[in-house]
Regions:
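Serine-hydrolase catalytic core recognition
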Residues: 1-193
């Protein structure tokens, strides 16, 4: 869900961004490659390797933030929901010394389990892209978690089924890493509150 820079209130915001800004946090949202409306090459660079090029772009944004005199580079966090939750955990486990805290809501963990209409559209099938599915699975990254990670999951989520989070938690326990896990019984993927 790409964002745009404009000089008006974002009415589609969940309120999280406003809340964090009111608490004194600097929010930075970057449209990485894979976002739409920038041409075919920009959008399709992520094909068969979701999250990989996007992380590179996000880290360019981090470099920019670190160059600002009013940004404390030792206190960076990351937040996202759904694919953004996937990116949150990806960034925290692939760049464990950069992000101190993360909040991942309804995160995709392994594209094998995600709905076919999206997963296979961007990743191809597991049979034709086994390397891509393995490389992008966060199950193999659980051992790299260092910062504080909060995972939020609605138990009635039919978009990113709870199997994603539960399997990641199992991998974290086996690796000796410990994210916080908040379960919301009866809640769907796009919960409020």
């Amino acid at each position: 869900h790409a964002h745009n820079v404009d000089a008006r209130w974002n009415y589609s915001s969940r309120g999280w961004e406003t809340y964090m800004a009111q608490k004194g946090y600097l929010l930075f949202i970057l449209d990485n490659r894979g976002s739409e409306n920038r041409g075919k090459a920009f959008e399709q660079v992520t094909f068969r390797q979701l999250g990989q090029e996007e992380m590179k772009d996000q880290m360019k944004g981090v470099e920019y933030l670190k160059s600002l005199p009013y940004v404390d580079a030792n206190r960076l966090g990351v937040h996202g929901w759904s694919f953004g939750g996937y990116m949150t955990i990806s960034l925290m486990t692939n760049y464990p010394d950069v992000f101190k805290v993360g909040v991942a809501g309804g995160p995709v963990i392994d594209w094998h389990w995600y709905e076919v209409m999206y997963g296979e559209r961007y990743m191809d099938t597991p049979q034709t892209n086994p390397e891509g599915y393995k490389k992008t699975s966060l199950l193999y990254q659980a051992k790299n978690l260092k910062g504080k990670l909060q995972i939020i999951q609605g138990l009635n989520d039919v978009t990113v089924v709870p199997q994603h989070c539960l399997t990641f938690l199992k991998a974290c326990i086996a690796a000796g890493t410990q994210p916080d896990f908040f379960v919301y019984p009866g809640e769907p993927h796009n919960m409020r509150g």
